[in-house]
Structure formats: structure tokens, C-alpha cells
Swiss-Prot record:
Native source organism of the sequence: Glaesserella parasuis serovar 5 (strain SH0165) (Haemophilus parasuis)
GO BP: fatty acid biosynthetic process; malonyl-CoA biosynthetic process
Name recorded for this polypeptide: Acetyl-coenzyme A carboxylase carboxyl transferase subunit alpha
InterPro entries the record matches: Acetyl_CoA_COase_a_su, ClpP/crotonase-like_dom_sf, COA_CT_C
Subunit text: Acetyl-CoA carboxylase is a heterohexamer composed of biotin carboxyl carrier protein (AccB), biotin carboxylase (AccC) and two subunits each of ACCase subunit alpha (AccA) and ACCase subunit beta (AccD).
Name of one Pfam family that matches: ACCA
Amino acid sequence: MTTEYLDFELPIAELEAKIEALRSAVGNDNKINLDDEIARLQKKSEELTKKTFSDLDAWQISRMARHPSRPYTLDYIERIFTEFDELAGDRAFADDKAIVGGIARLDGRPVMVIGHQKGRTVKEKVKRNFGMPAPEGYRKALRLMQMAERFNMPIITFIDTPGAYPGIGAEERGQSEAIARNLREMSTLKVPVICTVIGEGGSGGALAIGVGDKVNMLQYSTYSVISPEGCASILWKSAEKASTAAEVMGLTAPRLKELELIDNIVPEPLGGAHRNFDEMAANLKQRLLEDLADLDPLNAEALLDRRYQRLMGYGYV
């Protein structure tokens, strides 16, 4: 996959373009030896990338969370799990493609995996509704969670949505009810629930599959009640203030960890998750295995008590 660069990465992009040009020159003429120059530029590019990503602000992280090349739920399922068997439909209205889920194995152990799914091509984005689920998507997710509970399987969710779909049809079919029901039912599931924000964690649309015993965030993901643009439009009447809004919203992983709203921050490869899908998946898999090891000794009663105490601890100052 061709690397796409954001505007604050342009100096890095220029160096990478020079490296590719030198490699092409070597490929076209075997007599040319540019290994030393290529190595020098690679080292310079790596140092510049480290410097750039060591001090990203909240708005830059927000844009990283939305990066079009960022790995999505199905990318992680392919790399972390085996024997994935997708399950479809809410058994009431339709199969919402913005939510994917099914039974899989994590290191041989049966688990239920559920997550938001965006699209890359225009056709796929339309099919997945840009990762914005309708009520039937959340009802499908709940159906799979309840199935997991019946068969005593841990539940693993991947969160990556700008928010629940706000269309008229979704509201007519009970969008708010579907989200509220998921919040209630997830809080009482008698199996371990591990939630990870892998990109955008947008409002109730994210929270509807985000109530768990462990909540993780990828290093450059975000979690908030509204987008920076939406917040800026309300407070300053202009989306151009999005960068200011992002700073005051506290939507980054370090800030949410500081507030004890999440448990762990999963490190991303240098330059972001989209730079190395396999490395990112390996980091996330390790985190999931460690979380399961922490939760396995707890029986259903202990899980529910722990989850209740967690939820009651939210919102303090």
C-alpha cells in the first residue's frame, strides 16, 4: 500500500521520495552504487520521523486517527485471529456492514470479535456507511455478545467510528434505544469484555461497543463525545477552530489514561499504525493476551463487581 502523508509529514515525504528515486536509479543501472547515500537518507528520515512524532498536538493526533491508510477491524482480524467465521444480521431488520463480527480463535482460544469497519474505496465506503452504524448494526453486535455469553467466550471489540449514523431512517428505527440497550447489556455480561479504540472513538457510536472490563487505545487514536470540528462549530461558530477544540477536549490516549478512563495505551510503529500493519497487529495481540490473562482468574460475579466499580468511578473531578 502506498504511504499517504499528512501535511505535517511533508518533510518526511520529501526524504522518502528522494530515497525511492535513488532506488529506481540503481534498479535502472546496475553499475551505480548508491547504497551509502540511500542509507544516509534513510537514517535522516527515521530521525526526522522520530522528532516529528515525539511532539504531536491533539489536532494532529486526531488526523492520524482518521488516516485513510490506517488498519481497520478486518485488517486486525486477519493478522491477530485464526478461523474467523463472520456472523451477519440483527435478526430483526438487516445486516449492517458498518459493524463486522464473528467467532474466531486467539492463540487457539474461541473468542467473539466485533468492530466498526470503514471502507477504503468509494464503493466500500458506501457499503460500510463510512463506519457509521445504524441501529441494526448495534443490535447485531448485541446479538453476538449475548451469543458469546451463552457459550462462555470472551468478547473483543475494536472501536473506529466518527459516530452512530444520524440519518432519519436510523432515528426512526431507534438509534438511541439501540445504543442505550447496548450500554445496559454490556455492563452485565458475565464474560470478559476487552475494548480497544483503534482509530476514531466517536461519541455514543463508539461507546455502544465500548463498555468493558479493559479499555485500551492505540497511541494515535482518539475518544471523545464530539469531533473537534463539531465542538468548534458549537463553541466558536466555526469549524476552523478545530485545532483549538481538539486541545481542550482531552481526546488523546495519554490524557484519557491520566483521567483513568482507559487502562492501557498500545504503542504504534514509528510514523503510525498504517506504516506497518504487522507490527501494529503484533503489539495489539500482545495487549489482548495480557488483558485476558488478567481477567481469566475472575468468575462472573467478580467480573460484574469489577465492571460496576469501574463504571461508578467515571466522572469524578
